[in-house]
C-alpha cells in the first residue's frame, strides 16, 4: 500500500469516527471493496482496516460516555421487576374459596456515594398496613394501585484491620439475617432500624455475625422493639477436590436469637384465623426465640442443589405450642432460558409452626394466608422462558394444628387451605 493511501485511510477512519460526521458502515465497506478490487489493498488488509475502525469507534464511544455521564451517575445500579400472579385458594371449613389476579412491581437503585458508603432505595406496590406483602389485587374496577417506600437505607463499609468485612446499615432494609426459608420471616418483610454485619474469611471457612435493633411501635407508653443477633459459619472443606460434588460442597449453619419487647400491646393476637394476623394466643406475654438454621449445598452436572433445615423455639411461651420447624430441598436455578442445566428450579418444603412459636405478623403470608398454628407442604417449579423472565407454579397444602373454631374437630376436620400460585416474573 502506498504511503499516500495509508494517510488517506487514516484520515478517512478518523473522520468517520468523529461525532457529527460519521459515515454509514456500508459506505466504508464500499470504499474498502473498491480498494481491494483495484489491487490497492489485499482482502486481509481490508479486514484489518475494518477491525481497526470498529475498535477505534468502540474506544471513542466509551470515552464519550465517560465525558457525558458524570461519575455520580455511573456509580448507580438500577433494577426492578414485575410479577403477574394468578392465584386460587380452596378453603375447607369456611366456604371462602377465592380466585384472584395480583400484581407486584418493584423498582429501585443502589449507588456508591462515597468511598465506603452506599445508598439504596426501592419503591414497590403494597400497603402501609401490611408489612409482609407487596402484592396488589386486580379487583378495583381499574382503580390505581398504591406505591410505597419499600427500602431506603445507608450502608457504611469501613476497612477494619484484621476483619474481612464490616457493614453498618441504617434505615429501611432487607432481612439482615441469613435464612433459608420464610417460616419465621416473610421474604417481603422490610426492617426499620439499624444493623451490623461482620464476616471473617479463614481459609475454607467464613465466620459471620449479624445483629440489629428495630423499631416496631413508638405510639405506646412502652415502645415495642425487636433485637436480633445471629452467629454462623460456612465451610467448603473440599474446594480442591476433582469431584464436582465435593468441590462445590458447602455447609452453612447459624444460630439466631430474636428478642421482642413490649409487643403484647401492639400484636393483633388471638384474632380471626383466616386473616393474616391469625394465631398467637392473646395470653402470649413475650417472644424470645432461638432459631438455628442449617444448609448443605453442592452441584452435580452443573445443577446446584441444597438441603435445608430451620427450627424456632420461643422460650417465653408455655411449654406447649412454642416450637416450629421446616425441612426442604431445592434443585436447579432458573437463569438461562430453556437450558437443561440452568433453565429450571424445583423444590419441596415441609413446615410445622405451633401457635406461639413465632410472632405471627412477620411469618410467611403465602402459606395458608399467614399466621402460625399450621402444618403442611409446599412444592414449586420455575422455568426460565426468556432472558430475565421466568414462569413458575407453587402449591401450598396447609391445615391448622389446633381447632380455632372451638368445635373440637379432629385433625382431618380442622381448617385447611390448598393454594396454587402461577407467576410470570420479569426482571430488568
Each language-model region and where it sits:
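N-terminal secretory signal peptides that target proteins for export/translocation
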Residues: 1-5
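Outer-membrane beta-barrel pore domains
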Residues: 89-97, 137-144, 167, 245-250, ...
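Transmembrane beta-barrel architecture of outer-membrane proteins
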Residues: 77-83, 100-104, 146-151, 191-193, ...
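Short loop/turn motifs that connect adjacent beta-strands in outer-membrane beta-barrel proteins
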Residues: 66-78, 113-116, 159-166, 201-210, ...
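Surface-exposed coil loops of outer-membrane beta-barrel proteins
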Residues: 128-244, 256, 261-284, 357-370
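N-terminal periplasmic/intermembrane-space "pro-region" immediately following the signal or transit peptide
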Residues: 7, 11, 15-94, 428
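Surface-exposed loop and membrane-interface regions of Gram-negative outer-membrane beta-barrel proteins
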Residues: 85-104, 109-163, 177-186, 309, ...
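Transmembrane beta-strands of outer-membrane beta-barrel pores
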Residues: 84-90, 115, 123-129, 172-176, ...
Amino acid at each position: 500500500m502506498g504511503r499516500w493511501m495509508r494517510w488517506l485511510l487514516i484520515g478517512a477512519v478518523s473522520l468517520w469516527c468523529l461525532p457529527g460526521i460519521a459515515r454509514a458502515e456500508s459506505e466504508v465497506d464500499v470504499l474498502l471493496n473498491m480498494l481491494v478490487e483495484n489491487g490497492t489493498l489485499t482482502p486481509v488488509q481490508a479486514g484489518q482496516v475494518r477491525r481497526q475502525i470498529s475498535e477505534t469507534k468502540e474506544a471513542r464511544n466509551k470515552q464519550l460516555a465517560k465525558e457525558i455521564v458524570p461519575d455520580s451517575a455511573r456509580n448507580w445500579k438500577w433494577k426492578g421487576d414485575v410479577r403477574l400472579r394468578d392465584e386460587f385458594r380452596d378453603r375447607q371449613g369456611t366456604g371462602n374459596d377465592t380466585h384472584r389476579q395480583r400484581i407486584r412491581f418493584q423498582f429501585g437503585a443502589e449507588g456508591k456515594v462515597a468511598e465506603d458508603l452506599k445508598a439504596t432505595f426501592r419503591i414497590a406496590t403494597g400497603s402501609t398496613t401490611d408489612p409482609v406483602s407487596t402484592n396488589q389485587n386486580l379487583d378495583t374496577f381499574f382503580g390505581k394501585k398504591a406505591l410505597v417506600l419499600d427500602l431506603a437505607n445507608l450502608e457504611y463499609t469501613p476497612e477494619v484491620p484484621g476483619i474481612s468485612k464490616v457493614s453498618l446499615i441504617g434505615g429501611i432494609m432487607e432481612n439482615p439475617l441469613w435464612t433459608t426459608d420464610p417460616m419465621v420471616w416473610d421474604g417481603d418483610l422490610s426492617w426499620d432500624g439499624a444493623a451490623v454485619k461482620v464476616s471473617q474469611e479463614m481459609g475454607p471457612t467464613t465466620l459471620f455475625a449479624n445483629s440489629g435493633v428495630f423499631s416496631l411501635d413508638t405510639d405506646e407508653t412502652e415502645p415495642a422493639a425487636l433485637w436480633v443477633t445471629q452467629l454462623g459459619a460456612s465451610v467448603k472443606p473440599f474446594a480442591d477436590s476433582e469431584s464436582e460434588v465435593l468441590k462445590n460442597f458447602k455447609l452453612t449453619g447459624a444460630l439466631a436469637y430474636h428478642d421482642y419487647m413490649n409487643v403484647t400491646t401492639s400484636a393483633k393476637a388471638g384474632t380471626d384465623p383466616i386473616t393474616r394476623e391469625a394465631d398467637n394466643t392473646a395470653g402470649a406475654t413475650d417472644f424470645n426465640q432461638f432459631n438455628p438454621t442449617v444448609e448443605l449445598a453442592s452441584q452435580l452436572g452443573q445443577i446446584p442443589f441444597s438441603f435445608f433445615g430451620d427450627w424456632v423455639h420461643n422460650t417465653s411461651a408455655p411449654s406447649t405450642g412454642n416450637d416450629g420447624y421446616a425441612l426442604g430441598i431445592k434443585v436447579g436455578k432458573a437463569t438461562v432460558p430453556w437450558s437443561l442445566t440452568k433453565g429450571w428450579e424445583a423444590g419441596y418444603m415441609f413446615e410445622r409452626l405451633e401457635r406461639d412459636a413465632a410472632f405471627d405478623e412477620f411469618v410467611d403470608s403465602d402459606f395458608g394466608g399467614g399466621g402460625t398454628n399450621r402444618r403442611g407442604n409446599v412444592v414449586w417449579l420455575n422455568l426460565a422462558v426468556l432472558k430475565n423472565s421466568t414462569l413458575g407454579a407453587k402449591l401450598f397444602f396447609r391445615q391448622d394444628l389446633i381447632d380455632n373454631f372451638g368445635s373440637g374437630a379432629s385433625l382431618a376436620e380442622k381448617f385447611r387451605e390448598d393454594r396454587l400460585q402461577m407467576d410470570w416474573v420479569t426482571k430488568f
